Amino acid sequence: MSHKKRVYPTAQLQYGQTNIYEQHGVPQDAGAPQGQPLQSDIPYMNAQPGVIPGQGAPMMMDNGAMPQQQMFTPAQQQLNQQIDQTTAAMGNMQFNPAANESNMYYQQPLPQQQQQQQQQQGPAKPPKPMNQLYPIDLLVAFPPPISDLSLPPPPILFPLDTIPVPSEDALAPSNYIRSTLNAVPKSNSLLKKTKLPFSLVITPYQHLHDDINPPPLNEDGTIVRCRRCRSYMNPFVHFNQDGRRWKCNICNLFNEVPSFLDRMPNDTMSNRYMRNELRYSVVEYLAPKEYSLRQPPPSTYTFIIDVSQNAMKNGLLGTTTRTLLDNLDSLPNHDGRTRISILCVDNGLHYFAIPSDDQEGQQVEMMDVCDLDDAFIPRPDSMVVNLVQCRNNIETLLTKIPQIFQNNIINKFALGPALQAAYNLTRNEGGKIIVVSATLPNIGVGQLKKRVEEANVGTPKESQQLLTCQDPFYKTFTIQCNKVQISIDMFLASEEYMDVATLANLGHFSGGQTHFYPGFSAQRITDATKFSMEFAKHLSMDTSNEVVMRARGSTGIRTTGFHGHFFNRSSDLCAFSIMNRDQSYVFDITLDENIAAEYCYVQVAILLSLNTSQRRIRVITLALPTTDSIAEVYASVDQLAVTAAFTQKAIDKAQDTSLEEARRFINQSVEDVLTTYKKELVVQNTGAGGMPLRLCANMKIFPLLMHALTKNLAFRPGRVPSDHRAAALNYMESVPLKYLLKCIYPTIYSLHDMPDEVGLPDENNEIILPEPINASYSSFETYGLYLIDNGIDLFLWMGGEALPQLVEDAFGVPNILEMPIGKQEVPVVPESPFNERIRNIINRLRNHDDVITYQSLYILRSASNSDPVQANAKELSSLRMWASTHLVEDKIMGSEGYRDFLQMMKNKTSK
């Protein structure tokens, strides 16, 4: 491949250069307000390795080692690593510290004052290290530094030299669990004063398949738990001097150390300090028999397939059976016991009795049941069959199903009776019901009607009339399913109304998921590809069944709210018939009483059964420092986790009250945070004309994310089809954090001016991606090429004034009017390295191993003065409008731009 650089026009002014600030009325030398230190004066920016800002140089032993009594020394390595990672991205940020350095830490005692206090009070214990607060002016730090979206959260400063096995592995990885507050208020009154949520964002699994980077596994059957609170031994427990008792860090009870903790299964002595539970914050146990009420059941997949006229016309039936046929080997079957059942549905139920392959002369038999009120199962013993033993006959059936129903003219779909039949088929063992439908359920129990959208869309009645469950069957049925360990996944693909708001309840309360494919037509290869890719990844995904998850907190900490797809069995226990691998959960925490300890703990335990016939326990333990300083609380806020927590609360308000109330809540949350910060933490104010809008540096992206959230399809005002809005709400309430953020604030790449190495493999054979740009039209050039990624779809946007050479290199056509438009793939252009790099980037963005999503690609171009009247002008105009809604920093859909939003917040907080 030739690496000769193709030079296209590039912007003369880039963000970060002085002239861009002059565009917004900011002088060239406005790096910091007058009388305030520059970036180079901020301790955080000049931190030396091994030194916490404000703590001075570390003490050293004669041999160069750190003294043992410095409680922050081991944790400092983590802080230094995260500082190193963030320094480059923070270089372009416009920090605006407090008015003078004496107030840098918000009226903390100066060194002389500290010395005097210590002399008065006697020998004082060294203060524990805490994150420091660095204020900025949001209106000056503009455009917002979106590189912060990829930064790690503020470090959790914990004295690792105080635990049995000092190790960085004892600190919980943020991809498993994130706390909105990495310094916990010691009292509920302080927590309320902050106006910040105290929540945990929990992602128990990081990959679709369990064999990728699994956590350490204890296979010896040794499980040590506190006899009072039932928490599991973890890195933060303590042993007494003789090592015979251990102190629980959750409830502070001393427990006897079992003798088997120091012995191997073969009765030889072992070193307890090498055990995984004392070294790692995330660990998994192979559970003994007492953790099982029964033998782990086989994995069972029951497919309810729509064979009505709609499913035939749009090609969904053929696409489904072909994909299932091609992926039978991908179904998890580690123990060889996986079972399968297929049920076709229109206005009746079509069962299939599938004989085993060794039964010569026996063929698959179809049995029809038309009495939906009293449906029975003709031959239950041959309806749910072993995948291995009946493999050939299953393949034969999947090949014949499209032929059997190819002339079907029935436009009915009896989903309710089909669900009841599937329930009766699998109630003894449990399992997963997968529904594939192109038709609104319109006959039998649970039949639905098309709602009146015209009169309710965009009105205060929208939530209650269009986004609530239309029939209680879809909630009560999930209660039955949870009792027998059945979950439900929905794949809805149609050009017609499907009532996603109602049907999504099936997945929501059973631990499943609803996938929506509006306007689906298998005749469009892009639609068929997206459905097939996602359906195939869903089939191959590892799952756990018979799952319960509980979070235990140390003294004063209690979980009170739960968000995600599961059934809340009790006040602190979440039940999952099936736990998929591509979901995340948010737990809200309250403080029942004041916390006296310097550190608090939360432990999440998940009891589950695997497809390997094993019962396991996954334990995640999080340690957090506590504080009675609101400044230290704000300095340790994880702005991304806070966004996730507020998003879940906004979803609840959208579904329970109104969309207007949800938007009001989002904006009010930002106002409350800014007002509290100004009232409690801003030491000095300037005159009214130059009054800044202060917030701490670690939260500078929070207002942007919340503002962008109001413009998301789930919340934005205006006319949005109810199925699309309901699908967006359903997606956001369960998607892992990094995809939630991309859904809120889309990632945009500039392709026409990307460096030579971008789009090509690095030393690890990973395609290098461009640096994202701000989601604003001011970031665009009329002659540029841009790629927008919202986590669900991709948009390749060509500027209307692009040079012919750029168009030819990208699409292989000499004229911009000839470039492809709409939902399609980038054509392969031989001997065009630029075209190959574009396709490499798109493929990299689609290559996920933690979610099943396969983004559709939409190609469009901007309008230009030379645009002729074209047949697809309406489609192109709609596509431009849709793509422009992703420029969330701008004025779109009647909402204000981000700068105006900040100005509005400044006015409100100044009252």
Curated annotation (Swiss-Prot):
Compositional bias (Low complexity): 108-123
Region spans: Disordered: 108-130
InterPro entries assigned to the protein according to its UniProt record, in alphabetical order: ADF-H/Gelsolin-like_dom_sf (IPR029006), Gelsolin-like_dom (IPR007123), Gelsolin-like_dom_sf (IPR036180), Sec23/24_helical_dom (IPR006900), Sec23/24_helical_dom_sf (IPR036175), Sec23/24_trunk_dom (IPR006896), Sec23_24_beta_S (IPR012990), SEC23_SEC24_subfamily (IPR050550)
List of residues binding Zn(2+): 226, 229, 248, 251
Molecular-function GO terms, alphabetical: signal sequence binding; SNARE binding; zinc ion binding
Keywords for the protein's UniProt record, in alphabetical order: Cytoplasm, Cytoplasmic vesicle, Endoplasmic reticulum, ER-Golgi transport, Golgi apparatus, Membrane, Metal-binding, Protein transport, Transport, Zinc
Subcellular location: Cytoplasm; Cytoplasmic vesicle, COPII-coated vesicle membrane; Endoplasmic reticulum membrane; Golgi apparatus membrane
Top-level taxon of the source organism: Eukaryota
Membrane topology of the entry: Peripheral membrane protein
Signal peptide feature range: none
Region described as Zinc finger-like: 226-251
One GO process term, biological-process aspect: COPII-coated vesicle cargo loading
GO cellular component: COPII vesicle coat; endoplasmic reticulum exit site; endoplasmic reticulum membrane; Golgi membrane
Known function: Component of the coat protein complex II (COPII) which promotes the formation of transport vesicles from the endoplasmic reticulum (ER). The coat has two main functions, the physical deformation of the endoplasmic reticulum membrane into vesicles and the selection of cargo molecules.
Record text on subunit structure and interactions: The COPII coat is composed of at least 5 proteins: the SEC23/24 complex, the SEC13/31 complex, and the protein SAR1. Golgi apparatus membrane; Peripheral membrane protein; Cytoplasmic side.
Family per record: Belongs to the SEC23/SEC24 family. SEC24 subfamily.
Protein name: Protein transport protein SEC24-1
Gene this chain is encoded by: SEC241
